[in-house]
Regions:
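N-terminal secretory signal peptides that target proteins for export/translocation
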Residues: 1-14
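Primarily auto-inhibitory N-terminal propeptides
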Residues: 34-131
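Protease zymogen maturation seam
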Residues: 77, 98-166, 174-187, 197, ...
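Bacterial N-terminal signal peptides
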Residues: 18-30
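Generic structural signal for small/hydrophobic residues in well-ordered secondary structure
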Residues: 49, 82, 103-106, 150, ...
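Subtilisin-like serine protease catalytic core
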Residues: 149-195, 202-253, 266-269, 320-323, ...
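C-terminal subdomain of the subtilisin-like protease fold in secreted/lumenal serine endopeptidases
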Residues: 264-278, 287, 292, 299-301, ...
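Extracellular S/T/G-rich loop segment that most often corresponds to the catalytic His/Ser-adjacent loop
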Residues: 171, 301, 319-413, 454-455
Length: 467
């Protein structure tokens, strides 16, 4: 049980910006909302089905047709995304399919949302960053991730800025190139990207139409030492932009699963998922995504995900999935953020900004005092994908997760764990080198502690190989 007094949080999750997760009803046999709950959030005209291995293609087609479905799309081995005919409800189709012997499982196509928050302020559009160390407390402050020393560590290892490691950002897209109505963010290098894909528009141009994905990618690999803007933690890593969320920051589980498999097949070493499903979505509701996450682990790809912003003592999926790094959010004061989920399965925390949670006995927490600063990065200053700056501070576990993804990229580049560390080795290293917070006794609030990029990339220590 969490030690947090949730009745005295400074700001409820409902006050987060529109990309905060919606509440979703749990499924029993069919997608029916629980009494008093918000209706389930899933695609209204499509479902995901997995057939048993021995089922013949003709039999699969007949089963789908009998359920009122058509236009099957292959998403994974033996798995199909089915479009429902007009007048056929998701519940009716699922009832028919779940009674068939050739169907392993059938589920709605649940939607996830970006796990970030935006608090408007009057900073003004397009203003210069000034001294990055004054603004980026999350990198160099007392409760930052110790970026300067981490940069020195990996430079000494011949891999400055995590050079060469590919990090896939599965999000709203990234402002990675200038073409048509889109413009590359002025604080991204044109050489900092590898080929991505847009699973919303179904083309090879994963442009951002929201700003959330550009922010996340900037925390990982913003151009650094270029006399402009801010810095990126793994500034020489390559970003693979994969668009799985639409302009509202929403995307279905099947789309996210496709994005995960794409990233694995195209050379990503780390995948960042700054998104969350509603707290009511369970593992049984998103089997295709869990299979994709297992596919990533089996191919040696580390997946990092946001723990969620509902101030609940439960980690949201996909962060809750096995072997996924679940990242909570901490504040500038070294306290758990008031919106951050916590509980069993939390791996560690990273800077997410905002106000302190009300944690009795934690000397770093002052829920009644001034809120800590938010996290800053260069992204859109409005709705136009051509205007950039630091429009306001973002806060959320979305902002926390890329700190961990970037640290993992630095570990890989440093070679401290060998040439190709496994996800399990990377997770063990991240946990073993984290800074203890809150007294260090109860992992339900902070996991192993605050991610420390310097300690994680230093020579020697847990799991290090002889040089």
């Amino acid at each position: 049980m969490s030690l947090r007094n949730r009745r005295t949080l400074r700001r409820p999750c409902a006050s987060r910006w529109p990309l905060a997760a919606a509440c979703v009803a749990a499924l029993a046999a069919t997608p029916v909302a629980a009494a008093g709950a918000t209706p389930a959030v899933y695609a209204p005209r499509q479902i995901v089905v997995k057939y048993v291995t021995a089922t013949a293609p003709r039999a699969r087609a007949a089963t789908a047709h009998a359920a009122g479905a058509r236009d099957p799309v292959v998403t994974a081995p033996h798995t199909r995304l089915l479009r429902l005919a007009p007048g056929v409800s998701v519940g009716a189709a699922l009832r028919r399919l779940r009674g068939q012997r050739d169907v392993a499982w059938a589920v709605p196509d649940y939607r996830a949302r970006a796990a970030g928050g935006l608090i408007p302020n009057d900073r003004g559009e397009g203003s210069a960053a000034g001294d990055w160390q004054q603004l980026q407390w999350n990198f160099s402050g007392p409760f930052g991730v110790n970026a300067p020393q981490a940069w020195s560590n990996v430079a000494a290892d011949g891999a400055p800025g995590g050079r060469g490691v590919v990090v896939a950002v599965l999000d709203t897209g990234v402002a990675y190139a200038t073409h048509g109505r889109f413009r590359r963010s002025p604080d991204f290098s044109r050489y900092g990207f590898v080929g991505g894909y847009d699973f919303i528009a179904h083309n090879r141009f994963p442009d951002d139409r929201n700003g959330h994905g550009t922010f996340v990618a900037g925390t990982i690999a913003e151009a650094t030492n270029n006399h402009y803007g801010l810095t990126g933690l793994a500034f020489a890593a390559h970003i693979m932009p994969v668009r799985v969320l639409n302009s509202l920051g929403e995307g279905e589980a099947s789309t996210i699963a496709e994005g995960v498999r794409y990233a694995v097949k195209h050379g990503a070493r780390v995948i960042n998922l700054s998104l969350e499903f509603s707290k009511i979505v369970t593992a049984a509701d998103i089997p295709e995504l869990l299979e994709a996450l297992r596919f990533a682990r089996l191919h040696g790809v580390l997946v990092v995900a946001a723990a969620g912003n509902e101030a609940q003592a439960a980690i949201a999926y996909p962060a809750r999935a096995r072997n996924v790094v679940a990242v909570g959010a901490s504040t500038e004061h070294g306290c758990l953020a008031d919106y951050s989920n916590d509980g069993s399965g939390l791996t560690l925390v990273a800077p997410g900004g905002g106000a302190d949670a009300n944690l009795a006995g934690d000397p770093n927490c002052n829920a009644e005092g001034p809120a800590g600063r938010d996290v800053f990065q260069v992204t859109f200053t409005g709705s136009s994908p051509r205007r950039f700056g630091m429009p306001s501070g973002y806060e959320g576990t979305s902002m926390a997760a890329p700190h961990v993804a970037a640290t993992a990229a630095l570990i890989i580049a440093s070679g401290v764990l060998g040439r190709r560390p496994t996800p399990a080795q990377l997770i063990a290293r991240l946990r073993a080198t984290a800074r203890k917070l809150g007294g260090g006794g109860d992992e339900s609030l902070y996991g192993a502690g605050l991610v420390d990029a310097a300690a994680a990339t230093a020579p020697g220590g847990p799991g290090a190989v002889p040089r």
